[in-house]
Amino acid sequence: MKDCVEVLKALADPNRLRVFWLLARIDERICVAEAMDVLGESHYNASRILKSLKQAGLVTAEREGKWVFYSLPAPLAGSFHAHLLKAIQAIPAENFSEEIKRCQLRLGMREHGECIVGADSDAWRNVSTQAQTKRKPAARKRHTEVV
C-alpha cells in the first residue's frame, strides 16, 4: 500500500502530472533538456520533477553520454501501474494543449530520433518564438486621423 501512496503523491503535483501525461501520450523517451523546454522550467526544477517520478517508479532513466533519457517502464498487465497509466491517458488532451504544442515542436528538433539541442538554446527559442507568432492573429492597425 505504501508504494501506491507514493505513486499517487508523485502525481498530485501539476508539473509531475504534466510530464507523466506527456510521456504516456507520446510513447517516447525525453531528456531533461526537452522536459525543461516543454514545461518552461529551469534545469533544477525539471530534474527534480523527473527524479520524483523515478523515485515513485513511474519513469525509468537511461544515461547515454551527456544525456539522461526518461521513459515509462513497461507496466505489468493488470497491475496498479497499468490501471493508473490508463486513467492518466484518459485525461482530456485539451488540459495540456500548450504542453502538446511545445512537445511537438521540441521533439521535431531531434535528429535521427535523438535529442541534440541543449535546454533553452537559441535554436529552441527561435522555433518556439516562430510558432507563437504563427498562432497569434495579426493585430489590426488603428487608423487615426490627424485633423
Model-derived features: positions:
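N-terminal helix-turn-helix DNA-binding core of bacterial DNA-binding proteins
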Residues: K2-S42, E64-L76
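Amphipathic alpha-helical dimerization/coiled-coil segments
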Residues: A77-V147
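Short, hydrophobic-biased segments on the C-terminal half of alpha helices
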Residues: L50-K51
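Alpha-helical residues within the helix-turn-helix
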Residues: D37, K54-Q55
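Short, intrinsically disordered or compositionally biased N-terminal tails of bacterial proteins
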Residues: M1-C4, E145-V147
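A short, conserved structural fragment
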Residues: L58-E62
